[in-house]
């Protein structure tokens, strides 16, 4: 439900839990936002990393009205592992809003792109399909490995069902440790760095986020260290 204080403001759609938004979900959000004059900022940076059973729907593709009431942010940095080249795209159909964005990125001096990033983006989008398909298969296999490991060794720590991306949320409420404290203790006591769920707001309290975009041996070692940590509490 859109609160009255949001009328005329902005709403940011992001996915920190690995869900692939269904078209009908986006339609419901978009209709509410348009009705209340809310601009949707859709963070679609992980859009290429969708598992075969699911389908990515660009928010702006739903209708012309949605396109003009949204700002879409994408980048090849996640799917093609080129974050160090610092390049991204802001897609905005509304001319007035686009002018404000252009002025803002110039005022903040983040408008210039890395020439190597431009070339890497062109190569990634034009010639990276085979590599990307293999990556998605590997990421899904990593998730299935983690899911089976948790069922067998960590049943008291449920994880989200990953539909895309490489970020898995684990429910650690039973430990009774604040997420930020748990983050530091895992680093100091287990040599394992996970992200505290509270980085996404109070709703993330009690959750930890795993990045499984790594060799399976690294993931296995991380799960082993986490298991050892919780068993020694």
What are these model-derived regions, one by one?
Residues 1-8, 13:
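Single conserved hydrophobic/aromatic residue that forms the stacking wall/gate
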Residues 14-39, 46-82, 96:
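Active-site pre-lysine segment of PLP-dependent enzymes
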Residues 65, 92, 96-116:
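Active-site C-terminal subdomain of aminotransferase-like
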Residues 65-67, 81, 95-100, 129-131, ...:
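Short helix-loop capping/hinge motifs at secondary-structure junctions, enriched
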Residues 66, 176-178, 185-194, 200-233:
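PLP-dependent enzyme catalytic core of the Aspartate aminotransferase-like
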Residues 99-106, 124-147, 179:
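Structural signature of PLP-dependent enzymes
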Residues 115-118, 122, 138-147, 159-172, ...:
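Conserved glycine-rich beta-strand-loop-beta hairpin in the small C-terminal domain of fold type I
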